[in-house]
């Protein structure tokens, strides 16, 4: 069962944000969404998550139009990590991660506690479990929010039912080690747990290293879509980012690329 955007067009205040964009997120794949600032990446992610209604076009989860699903139905099938999660309450870290279980009221407290423990461990933030969320650094908060969406994805996972995870710039506040850990976890969720994962990143080389498929947006349109070798070309770098770049085979990772701006 795929999550599929078909010919999406979306505008805000009369200004076009997306124009005729189609994209499929399939189980078992990690898709990277790239593009310059203002290209429409976050808008496309929000539309795929069912949070924004397109002016034309549809988003389908299998055969179901996303517009026909209510908020709880959506939350039980997909989890979203926004670019800037807002949380104004003085909650403990475990309470924040436990919010991932909110769409699943049938879970008993013991099951929720285990879900939280597992998510904290998978996100490598177990050592923060007793801290207060507002007292954390920006990077620590980002990792705790990642644990929250992991809990949401793993809750009440029925065999054969695909879950989708959407991450909007999840590594923007992270140091290099934690960037790699988060993206490695995202890829494992796709390849080993069979999830469909969409991630927005600005680091082209991180996208080249971890993603199976890349979608390159330019001015609200899909400029390129495919494996990294097809998308990360000097011509695309010039047209989309306005930079001259060399694209080389990665010296230590077979089948992966390095993009070096001149």
From Swiss-Prot:
Membrane topology of this protein: Peripheral membrane protein
Cellular component GO terms, alphabetical: plasma membrane
Major place of residence: membrane
Ranges for domain ABC transporter: 3-244
PROSITE patterns the UniProt entry points to: ABC_TRANSPORTER_1, ABC_TRANSPORTER_2, HMUV
Enzyme Commission code: 7.6.2.-
Subcellular location: Cell inner membrane
EC category: translocase
Positions that bind ATP: 35-42
Disulphide-bonded residues: none
Alphabetically ordered keywords of this record: ATP-binding, Cell inner membrane, Cell membrane, Membrane, Nucleotide-binding, Translocase, Transport
GO terms for MF: ATP binding; ATP hydrolysis activity
Assembly notes: The complex is composed of two ATP-binding proteins (HmuV), two transmembrane proteins (HmuU) and a solute-binding protein (HmuT).
Function noted in UniProt: Part of the ABC transporter complex HmuTUV involved in hemin import. Responsible for energy coupling to the transport system.
Similarity comment text for this entry: Belongs to the ABC transporter superfamily. Heme (hemin) importer (TC 3.A.1.14.5) family.
Name this protein carries in UniProt: Hemin import ATP-binding protein HmuV
Natural source organism: Bordetella parapertussis (strain 12822 / ATCC BAA-587 / NCTC 13253)
């Amino acid at each position: 069962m795929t999550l599929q955007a078909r010919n999406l067009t979306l505008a805000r205040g009369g200004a076009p944000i997306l124009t005729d964009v189609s994209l499929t997120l399939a189980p078992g794949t990690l898709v990277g969404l790239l593009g310059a600032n203002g290209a429409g990446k976050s808008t496309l992610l929000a539309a795929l998550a069912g949070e924004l209604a397109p002016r034309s076009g549809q988003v389908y989860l299998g055969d179901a139009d996303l517009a026909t699903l209510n908020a709880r139905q959506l939350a039980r099938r997909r989890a979203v990590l926004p670019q800037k999660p807002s949380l104004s309450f003085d909650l403990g870290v475990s309470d924040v991660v436990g919010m991932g279980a909110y769409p699943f009221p049938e879970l008993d407290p013991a099951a929720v506690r285990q879900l939280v423990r597992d998510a904290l461990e998978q996100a490598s933030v177990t050592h923060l479990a007793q801290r207060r969320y507002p007292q954390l650094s920006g990077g620590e908060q980002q990792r705790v929010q990642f644990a929250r969406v992991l809990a949401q994805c793993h809750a009440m996972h029925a065999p054969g039912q695909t879950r989708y995870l959407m991450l909007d710039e999840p590594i923007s506040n992270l140091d290099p080690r934690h960037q790699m850990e988060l993206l490695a976890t995202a890829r494992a969720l796709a390849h080993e747990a069979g999830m469909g994962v969409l991630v927005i990143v600005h680091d082209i080389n991180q996208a080249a290293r971890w993603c199976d498929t890349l979608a390159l947006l330019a001015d609200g349109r899909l400029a390129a879509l495919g494996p990294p070798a097809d998308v990360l070309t000097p011509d695309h770098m010039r047209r989309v980012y306005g930079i001259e770049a060399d694209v080389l085979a990665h010296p230590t990772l077979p089948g992966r690329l390095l993009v070096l701006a001149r």
